Amino acid sequence: MKNNNEGSTLNKAHWSLWVVGLTAFIWHGLGLFNLAMQLNPNVLAQMPDSHRAIAESRPVWVTIIFALSVLNGAIGGVHLLLKMKFASSSFLISLLAAVVAILHAIIKGNALSIFSPFEISLAIIGPLITGLFFLWYSIKAKKKFWIR
C-alpha cells in the first residue's frame, strides 16, 4: 500500500520488522528472566560473593528502573510485531531506564572492577547497543509507514 499525506495507510513492512520485533521481545524477555533470577534468594545464594553484593545492595528504585527497562523493551517488541507506532516510545523508555540502571551499577555498584570483560559486554555494552538499535529501527519503521 502507498502512504498518503495523513499516514493513515501502511506501506508493506520489510521482512526485517518481524525479525527485529521478535528479537526485541526475546532479548527483553531474557532481561525479565534475569530480573526474576536476581530477586530469587536461592539463585542469589549461588552467585559469586561480588555479584551477590551488587544485587543485594541495589536500592529498590534501581530494581524498579531495571524492571521498567526490560518490560518496556518487551512491550516495544510486541508493538513492532503488531505494527503499532508506540514501539518507539516503549523503546525510548526502555533505553533511558537502562542507562539509569547501568550508571548506578557503574558508579555505586563498582561493576567495572567486579565484572569480567564478557560480563561488562553482556550487562553494560549489550543493552546500550541493542537499546539504541531497537529505538532507531522503530523510528525508521514509523517514518517508512510500516507501523501506524
State what each model feature region is.
Residues 2-148:
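Topology signature of small-to-medium multi-pass alpha-helical membrane proteins
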